[in-house]
A protein has these predicted regions:
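N-terminal acidic, glycine/proline-rich low-complexity segments
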Residues: 20-339
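Bacterial N-terminal signal peptides that target proteins for export
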Residues: 1-7
Length: 339
């Protein structure tokens, strides 16, 4: 008979060595407004390939039909053509952007440079309905959300009523299913001596940002404007690290958006990195508190007196910034399976 102490040690060792379950992730993006969204989705797929996460859906807050097409092209490039895509209706930034047009680029034989079958946002369902469907099907307290665009979709989800997918309101559904919301938005530290930078993702839909900041029922971790600035993506990687394929969505999008030599801030990838790897020491966190969004889009953080606030923001030392930058680069340049 095995001694109880030895059995206990073996069981503890087995539990310690067991791989962590993949993070169930929903990614909400304004794909097309900046190339860091492409970096973030690239990272997600490479982490999914490693078993670190499971991408349940991508929802889009940029209201242009090519945004969904390019998201599907990226998903397909990485070997995940069936990831559900939902789109905003009557949302912000209806202009095409600089690189979503890559979804329409053709090879000499007439085939798509980046194959995909969602040809337009008109072919995709509305985001809130898709979000409710996906969340309702997941176990309780199992889903992480990464929002790297505007607040429109998630604010509308908050207000959504019961439907065929769930008898719960949007707020109650989120409270039941979601563990954390990791947001790239706002500014919480001084950047180039500017203390009140009005961050893009907030100012494009201020009422939605205000609603979410007040009424969101789960913990929120904010990756502020200052974080991505401090861990900019090195342009040398774009120039050298994607030679394993003639066309890569990230490299092509980077050149279309603002070609090297320039180092692009990694705003959106930092929110994704935290959502999937919150315990790897890439970032520190502020004390618990609350974030207020003013009418002009300014964000203010106040620590809670009782230490029970639901909002925190990312803090990153110079040493952590170097780690974050290298992690993002390696997670972006990794070749998809079979390439």
């Amino acid at each position: 008979m095995m001694k109880p102490t030895l059995l206990t040690l073996l069981l503890c060792s087995a539990a310690f060595l067991a791989p962590a379950a993949p993070v169930k992730l929903i990614f909400d993006t304004d794909m097309g407004n900046d190339v860091d969204d492409v970096m973030a989705l690239d990272m997600i797929h490479n982490l999914q390939k490693r078993g670190a996460c499971e991408l349940l859906a991508v929802t889009i807050t940029k209201d242009h039909p090519q945004a969904a097409a390019f998201v599907d092209a990226i998903n397909t490039f990485h070997g995940y053509p069936d990831v559900p895509i939902g789109v905003v209706r009557n949302g912000a930034t209806p202009e095409p952007g600089k690189f979503n047009k890559l979804a329409d680029e053709k090879n000499p034989d007439g085939s798509f440079r980046f194959p995909h079958d969602v040809l337009s946002g008109a072919d995709a369902p509305e985001a809130v309905g898709l979000l409710r469907k996906i969340l309702a099907a997941q176990p309780d307290k199992s889903v992480a959300l990464a929002q790297v665009g505007f607040f429109t979709n998630f604010a509308r989800l908050l207000d959504s009523p019961a439907d065929e997918h769930s008898p719960l309101t949007g707020r109650d559904l989120l409270k039941q299913k979601v563990t954390v919301l990791s947001i790239m938005a706002g500014t919480f530290q001084t950047v180039n001596w500017e203390t009140r930078h009005l961050e893009y993702n907030v100012i494009k839909d201020v009422p939605a940002a205000q609603k979410l900041a007040v009424h969101w029922p789960t913990p929120i971790v904010w990756s502020g404007y200052e974080i991505g600035i401090a861990a900019a993506y090195p342009h040398e990687s774009i120039e050298r690290d994607f030679e394993y394929v003639k066309h890569h969505p990230l490299k092509d999008a980077y050149y279309a958006y603002n070609p090297p030599p320039h180092d692009r801030p990694t705003w959106d990838p930092t929110a994704v990195l935290y959502a999937i790897y919150p315990d790897r020491g890439y970032f520190d966190l502020s004390p618990p508190g609350g974030v207020t969004v003013e009418d002009n889009g300014a964000t203010w953080y106040r620590p809670s007196k009782d230490g029970k606030g639901r909002h925190r923001y990312l803090v990153m030392s110079a040493a952590q910034a170097a780690r974050v930058r290298e992690a993002i680069v390696q997670l972006c340049v990794e070749p998809p399976a079979g390439r």
